[in-house]
């Protein structure tokens, strides 16, 4: 739930409780759940026999959706079995439109800044997820590169002419170069996290539908309160398309340079495991364009951010809490959405983790088999908590207690009833991943990787 809270993902948490007649004195399993959930939940209430049950549920749902936070209801055992003929609540008349159009003054000021900029760029964060098409349309009109935050990876496909990849520590030199060369930054739905690498010395137009996010960490040239899609559409109406396609041509050149650099890095294999460059090159080639990809934390995630080239995939990650073990449970949730939500029906679900991340929830692979969740899990096994080792070396400390004693994860997947394959040579990657992606049951590909080739 803390993951959901800091990533602003709505959650409705329903928890049980002992019967009301023994609640409070300290009976078996009697815990003050309201206090326990107080810090993580925006709304938390016990549901009693005399409560207005439909109204409490309506308020909980509204709090989760509007606040994009955790809402929590506590159900004592006896309340759960009370018969009721009360009418269920409805969102009708309870939630207004969520489109906030920026003021005319703000739009005019933004238009002037953009019109006078020679090298504008767009930084698209996860806050622009529902407005990504409008952002891309604006970028095309301006001839501007679009780089994403790491959490926003995939919001624009890397094969789009205006795409510049991910900005920051998990990103590409393409995005960094355009950031350095820019004379105006349009930040759309980005929180300015310290990993992102936005140059604060440059003029910034920041647009967000949450006023607290505007200039949150430092002043910006022009903070604009409004829905990002509404802003982009309004600016497109004010500005003529640019005839200068210089930056788009430079993007083509920079991508060619980066791909050549990746080929150079492929040659750095030291015989101590498969290079993550090779792995994500193959996955970029084979992963369906409409797939949903859940990534974990650690070196595997940094490599995914740099080397995986999106073609339309939806990416899920623990963006702000950085919870190790996130990928597989998130993939399970995404798979459930493919069964229930028309927008996601039929889409392939892939999860990516290191050995440390998979080790947090290994029994969930048996759950995949039990429920027929044909998720493909790609596991980078370097036999250590590689990110922690890297941080210890960077701090000039001894590398301490980061090595892992692992079983054969591929064999474990097979014992659970799924498909399991182990790859130790780059030449075997493509066939192994293709087979796993096409399996009609849960599949795991364990790839022995070099911890130092990130």
Predicted regions mapped to residue ranges:
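A short, charged, Gly/Pro-tolerant segment at domain boundaries
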Residues: 76-81, 252-259, 450-454
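Thiamine diphosphate
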Residues: 14, 22-29, 215-217, 222-225, ...
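A conditional alpha-helix N-cap/helix-loop micro-motif detector
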Residues: 53-54, 100-107, 168, 273-276, ...
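Flexible, glycine/charged-enriched surface loops at secondary-structure junctions
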Residues: 70-72, 242-255, 269, 444
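Well-ordered alpha-helical segments embedded in enzymatic catalytic cores
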Residues: 56, 105-109, 174, 231, ...
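Active-site diphosphate/adenylate-binding microenvironment
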Residues: 256-342
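Generic enzyme active-site microenvironment
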Residues: 206, 294, 352-353
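N-terminal alpha/beta PP-like core and its mobile active-site loop of ThDP/TPP-dependent enzymes
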Residues: 1-243, 286-289, 346, 367, ...
């Amino acid at each position: 739930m803390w993951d959901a809270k800091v990533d602003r993902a709505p959650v409705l948490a329903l928890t049980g409780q002992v019967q009301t007649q023994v609640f409070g004195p300290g009976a078996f399993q009697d815990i003050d759940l309201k206090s326990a959930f107080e810090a993580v939940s925006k709304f938390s209430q016990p549901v009693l026999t005399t409560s207005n049950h439909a109204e409490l549920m309506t308020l909980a749902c509204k709090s989760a959706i509007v606040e994009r936070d955790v809402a929590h209801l506590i159900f004592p055992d006896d309340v759960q079995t009370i018969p009721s003929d009360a009418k269920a609540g409805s969102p009708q008349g309870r939630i207004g439109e969520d489109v906030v159009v920026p003021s005319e003054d703000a739009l005019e000021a933004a238009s002037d800044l953009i019109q006078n900029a020679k090298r504008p760029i767009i930084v698209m964060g996860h806050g622009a997820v529902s407005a990504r098409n409008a952002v891309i349309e604006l970028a095309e009109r301006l001839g501007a590169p679009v780089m994403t935050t790491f959490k926003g990876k995939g919001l624009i496909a890397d094969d789009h002419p205006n795409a510049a990849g991910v900005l920051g520590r998990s990103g590409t030199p393409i995005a960094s170069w355009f950031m350095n060369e820019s004379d105006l930054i349009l930040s759309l739905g980005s929180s300015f996290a310290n990993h992102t690498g936005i140059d604060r010395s440059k003029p910034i137009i920041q647009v967000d539908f949450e006023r607290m996010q505007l200039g949150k960490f430092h002043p910006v040239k022009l903070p604009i309160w409004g829905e990002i899609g509404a802003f982009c559409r309004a600016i497109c109406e004010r500005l003529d398309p640019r005839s200068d396609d210089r930056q788009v041509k430079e993007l083509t050149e920079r991508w060619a340079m980066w791909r050549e650099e990746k080929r150079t890095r492929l040659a750095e294999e030291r015989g101590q495991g498969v290079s993550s460059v090779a792995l994500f090159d193959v996955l970029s080639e084979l992963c369906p364009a409409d797939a949903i990809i859940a990534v974990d934390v650690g070196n595997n995630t940094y490599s995914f951010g740099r080397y995986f080239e999106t073609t339309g995939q939806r990416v899920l990650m623990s963006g702000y809490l950085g919870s190790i073990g996130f990928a597989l449970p998130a993939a399970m949730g995404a798979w459930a959405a493919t069964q229930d939500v028309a927008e996601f029906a039929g889409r392939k679900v892939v999860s990516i983790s290191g050995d440390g991340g998979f080790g947090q929830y290994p029994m969930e692979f048996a759950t995949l088999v039990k429920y027929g969740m044909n998720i493909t899990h790609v596991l980078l096994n370097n036999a250590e908590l590689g990110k922690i080792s890297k941080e210890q070396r960077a701090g000039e400390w001894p590398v301490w207690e980061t090595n892992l004693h692992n079983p054969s994860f591929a064999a474990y997947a097979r014992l659970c009833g799924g498909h399991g394959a182990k790859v130790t040579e780059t030449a075997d990657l493509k066939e192994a991943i293709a087979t796993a992606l096409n399996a009609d049951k849960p599949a795991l590909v364990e790839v022995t990787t070099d911890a130092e080739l990130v």
